[in-house]
UniProtKB/Swiss-Prot annotation:
CDD domains: Ribosomal_L1 (cd00403). Belongs to the universal ribosomal protein uL1 family. Keywords: Cytoplasm, Ribonucleoprotein, Ribosomal protein. The keyword Cytoplasm applies. One of its GO terms (biological process) is translation. Component of the large ribosomal subunit. Component of the large ribosomal subunit. The ribosome is a large ribonucleoprotein complex responsible for the synthesis of proteins in the cell. This is Large ribosomal subunit protein uL1. InterPro entries: eL8/uL1-like, Ribosomal_uL1, Ribosomal_uL1-like, Ribosomal_uL1/biogenesis, Ribosomal_uL1_3-a/b-sand. GO terms for cellular component: cytosolic large ribosomal subunit. GO terms for molecular function: RNA binding; structural constituent of ribosome.
Amino acid sequence: MSKVSSAVLRQGVATILKEKKERKFVETVELQIALKNYDPDKDKRFAGSVKLPNITKANYKVCVLGDAQACEAAQKENIPFMDVDALKALNKDKKLVKKLARKYNAFLASDSVLRQLQKILGPGLNKAGKFPTLLGKNEDLKVKINELQCQVKFQLKKVLCMGVAVGNVKLTEDQLVANIERSISFLVSLLKKGWQNIKCLYIKSSMGAPIKIY
């Protein structure tokens, strides 16, 4: 049972969409969370991902780290890819791996590449929070990318506040509301005491002011 008023949420989303301006980029809509009654040092730090009904970021870039079959499929669909030789060419250079991590929102990797990734690249992608998702042998590349584009990840680190991208200003009011409701519902399921651990919730666009919804 959500404690966020449907009317308050809709009003907040409507305000974000009404105040959006023409920009050179599509603004992301973020859910900002402040927790309470939680000790990151003592309590278990939660992490989890959920697939939302609609795409979160408008220009979500995915790169395939693949075997020959996956790279061929990526090339056909005009999706960026790197094979093992291209990855080895980075020579575990921390700056180059960091640059690669910054260039894309997410990575997909074939099983054979995933198993040797740490050895080839070092821990760079993992440190950037972009460890690749497994791309199975017979999985449809476009479907897999769509799943990533709709996915949001919650991870508690050392501080009791976090922000996650839950949509963008190109979505409709209904689409944004659906994404935000699903995100909040999943977040509550991760928390030790559910709603008792939530201090407040805000939504905001990249360039807009935060709007309190709880």
